[in-house]
């Protein structure tokens, strides 16, 4: 009996950590897509931004501006509209995420305006940060995101050259 309970709790925990990492990736992807929109509108795009996701179960590499890939249990990351991401939620072109807060696509849109996310983390638009507390540690500042979880998953960004000054 106790062994079954422990196994179920471990599965639930691993599922929660997978969802947390997927949400971190989704947040980072949105941030990069929004930055790409802004630079495209202003006409001074930086060089290609790459996003790498490394976890104990799968690896997905992508570059901003239209990409698709599998991650974890059927999770897809995509720059285009109607791509799916985690547990049936979708993003791109103004769809909702995770059933609790909506995100708009297109230039100049942002996270937040007071909306909550994942129970323990909150967002503002622009360069403000957020923190999530489900056994991991993550932070967003400006254009970069670093994430760590007790499962050992991580999110890494690399940018091959600096943005030109305005």
UniProtKB/Swiss-Prot annotation:
Subunit structure: Heterotetramer of two type I and two type II keratins.
Designated name of the protein: Keratin, type II cytoskeletal 68 kDa, component IB
UniProt key word Coiled coil: yes
Family as reported in the entry's similarity comment: Belongs to the intermediate filament family.
Region (Tail): 42-166
Highest rank taxon of the organism: Eukaryota
One of the record's GO cellular component terms: intermediate filament
Keyword annotations: Coiled coil, Intermediate filament, Keratin
Lineage of origin: Eukaryota, Metazoa, Chordata, Craniata, Vertebrata
Domain IF rod: 1-41
Positions with biased composition (Low complexity): 147-166
Organism this protein belongs to: Bos taurus (Bovine)
Comp. bias regions, Gly residues: 122-146
Location of region: Coil 2B: 1-41
